Amino acid sequence: MKLKSVIATLAVATLALAGCSVDRSGDQADRPTIRIGYQSFPSGDLIVKNSRWLEEKLPNYNIKWTKFDSGADVNTAFIAKELDFGALGSSPVARGLSAPLNIPYKVAFVLDVAGDNEALVARNGSGINTIAELKGKRIGTPFASTAHYSLLAALSQNGLSANDVQLVDLQPQAILAAFDRGDIDAAYSWLPTLDQLRKNGKDLITSRQLAKDGKPTLDLGAVSDEFASAHPDVVDTWRQQEAHALKLIHDDPAAAAKAIAAEIGLSPDEVAGQLKQGVYLTPEQVASPEWLGSEGKPGNIAVNLQSASQFLADQKQIPSAAPLQTFQDAVYTKGLPGAITQ
C-alpha cells in the first residue's frame, strides 16, 4: 500500500474515533461485537442503552456503545467501517447516501421527528429579533447536521444564504461555551444543549415550524449494508428494542425520562420536559407508508431524504442530489410492519 493511502486510511480512522466515548462494559473476548453509535439527544436509543435490553436479548454478543457528537461524526465512523448501527439525523443520512460519500447503509428506524427540540436561538444582547437580522452575524451550528440543514432552510426562507452570514462549525458543547462568551450571535442546535442556550437567548424559529413549511428533519437509526445482510436476526432484535423504547416513552414517560436522564446527566424532570418538545412516533407509525413503509414498499421517508439531498445540492453542500431510487433502496423494510409492531 502506498504511503499516501496508508495516511489517508489512518486519518479516516482517527476522525471516526475523535470526540467520542466508548462503553464496552462486560465484553468477553470469545464473543462477536455489535458496534453501536449513539448521540446524547433524548431518544429511545438512550433507553435501550441504559436498560441493557440488547445485552439481555443478545447474550452471545458483546455490545459496544460509542458516543458521537454529531451525525457527521457518525458518517465518518461508518465510512471507516467502525459501526454496525448508528443514530444520526436525516440531513447527514441524505448527505451520506449521496455522492461523493455513497455510504453503504440503510435507514432501519425513526428515532424521533424534530419539533421544538431543535431551534435557532439568538443570544440576549445581540440585538437580533428576527432571522433577517442575522445578516453578517456569526452563527454556530454543527456542520452536516440536521441543525445545519434547518439553519440553511431558515435563512433561505428569509432571503438569506450561507454567504450572507458567518457560519461557525461547532459541536453542541462548544456552541454553548462560545454563546456564553459572546463569540457567536446565534446558534442552531438541539437538546440538551438547546435548553442551556435558551437561558441566555430566545428562539427565532424551531424545527417544528420548519417542518410545517415543508422542511422536516428526523433522527434516524441506520445499519450498515454488510451487517444487515449478515445478521438480519440481530437487526430484528435491535428494531424490536427501539420499538419497545418508543412504547415506553408513550406509556410510561416518567420511566423513560429516568432512563434517559441517567445517560445524559440531567434530572428526570428536566428530561421529561425535553421529551415533550420532540415528536416520538408509535411503532405502528414508524412502519406506516408515511415513514418506513412495509416490506418491499419503502415509505415516504425516501421522498423526505431525496428532498433533503436536493436542498443540500441547491445550497452547494453536495455536488448533486441523488435520485429517489437511491433513497428507496436505502430504506430497510424487511419484515415490516410485523417485525416491530408485534
Per-region residue spans from a language model:
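Structured segments of extracytoplasmic/periplasmic soluble domains
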Residues: 57, 77, 81, 95-99, ...
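Conserved C-terminal helix/tail region of periplasmic/extracytoplasmic solute-binding proteins
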Residues: 304-342
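Solvent-exposed, acidic/flexible segments
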Residues: 47, 67, 71, 86, ...
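Short, surface-exposed acidic
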Residues: 63, 162-165, 265-277, 319-326
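Secondary-structure end/capping motifs
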Residues: 230-314
